[in-house]
Design a protein with these regions (language model features):
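Hydrophobic faces of well-ordered beta-strands that scaffold small-molecule active sites
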Residues: 62-66, 91-93, 140-144, 170-172, ...
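Glycine/Thr-rich beta-alpha phosphate-binding loop at enzyme active sites
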Residues: 197, 207-242, 246, 284-289
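Glycine-rich phosphate-binding active-site loops on the catalytic face of alpha/beta enzymes
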Residues: 89-100, 169-171, 176-179, 220-228, ...
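Alpha/beta catalytic cores of nucleotide-metabolism and tRNA/nucleoside-modifying enzymes
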Residues: 1-3, 27, 37, 242-253, ...
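Alpha-helix-loop-beta-strand connector modules within alpha/beta enzyme cores
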Residues: 104-140, 185-199, 233-252, 260, ...
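N-terminal amphipathic alpha-helix/helix-capping segment at the start of soluble metabolic enzymes
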Residues: 1-10, 15, 21, 25, ...
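Catalytic beta/alpha-barrel core
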Residues: 116-119, 167-179, 193-202, 207-208, ...
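Catalytic cores of alpha/beta
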Residues: 74-82, 202-212, 254, 258-275
Length: 308
């Protein structure tokens, strides 16, 4: 297993019922609304509402990913608004980082370019605030790494900053539930969800335990490895998604390698409640990262596929 999958897979799980599924076992003491987990926060409820609205329309939720500050601050805001207007149900906003261990070549390149263009944590939070102000109906879920948000502390300041900017939740790619208790407490106090991840290599019992701790939705990594556009998804992805759904009581969003409308259709038929598309959208922006219209067209095609 790659170190990227280790970081993301150990992180967390959860899955939301798309119409009356019974709650999954909580495992590991992860009581819903109790002393652990963040699924009872206002942010988690906003995330769940977006998944529920998509399910009521008979489709999966579409979650485009963008890199904050790529290729520059103004264009990344235009990218976010274009994705929202083309059919996004939620937006995942990657906070540029110098060592993005879960990211493949495309997202690493975009993150590096954003940093060279002046992206910082403060400016990324300002972007989230601008998106939230312009499109208040779309839940925003930043993705970051533990060193960015927590460092040597408990992350209270970062959680509050993200909440104040309008984020509904946060994905910390290399944070596991075993280590996430203090940051969960900070997120609960701030009112946002901590979204954890599972991978194909995560043991079934651990998937259930992670699912009990995630907030809003469970990030289901579709493959072993890092992010990046793929021609096809793993053959066993349908069975894997079904297995994760069976142990999760919050929505399951599937990402990594999801690149084409046909991938979205495969995952929807497998039972995914949402699909996350990242590298393919960055690629659509072209070599200079500025073809916002092309990105909007791809998001539109992906949105159609969520109900096919």
């Amino acid at each position: 297993m790659s170190r990227a999958t280790v970081g993301r897979a150990g992180a967390g799980a959860g899955h939301g019922p798309s119409g009356g599924r019974s709650a999954a076992p909580t495992g590991d003491g992860g009581r819903r609304g109790g002393a652990t987990g963040t699924d009872a926060t206002p942010g988690a409820r906003r995330i769940r509402a977006a998944f529920d609205a998509a399910a009521e329309e008979g489709r999966a939720a579409l979650i485009p990913y963008l890199v904050a500050g790529y290729p520059d601050a103004r264009t990344s805001l235009a990218v976010a608004l274009a994705a929202a207007d083309a059919g996004a149900d939620l937006l995942e906003v990657g906070l540029p980082y110098s060592d993005p261990l879960a990211d493949g070549a495309t997202l690493q390149r975009a993150s590096s370019a954003a940093l060279r263009a002046g992206a910082t944590l403060d400016r990324s939070v300002e972007l989230i605030e601008a998106i939230a102000a312009a499109r208040p109906g779309i839940p925003l879920v930043p993705m970051a790494y533990a060193n960015q948000l927590i460092g040597g502390g408990d992350g209270r300041a970062a959680a509050r900053r993200l909440a104040d900017a309008g984020a509904s939740g946060v994905i910390v790619a290399d944070l596991t539930p075993d280590e996430g208790g203090p940051f969960e407490a900070a997120a609960r106090d701030a009112g946002i969800a901590v979204v954890y991840l599972v991978a194909p290599t995560t043991a079934p019992a651990r998937r259930a335990a992670i699912a009990a701790r995630t907030g809003g939705f469970l990030y289901c990594v579709s493959l072993v490895g890092v992010t990046g556009a793929r021609r096809s998804l793993p053959r066993a992805v349908g069975r894997y998604v079904a297995e994760v759904r069976a142990v999760s009581s919050v929505p399951v969003g599937v990402g990594f390698g999801v690149s084409r409308p046909e991938h979205v259709r495969v995952l929807r038929r497998a039972g995914a409640d949402g699909v996350i598309v990242a590298s393919a959208l960055v690629d659509a922006l072209g070599p200079d990262g500025r073809d916002v219209a092309a990105l909007g067209r791809l998001v539109g095609l992906l949105r159609v596929a969520t109900g096919a």
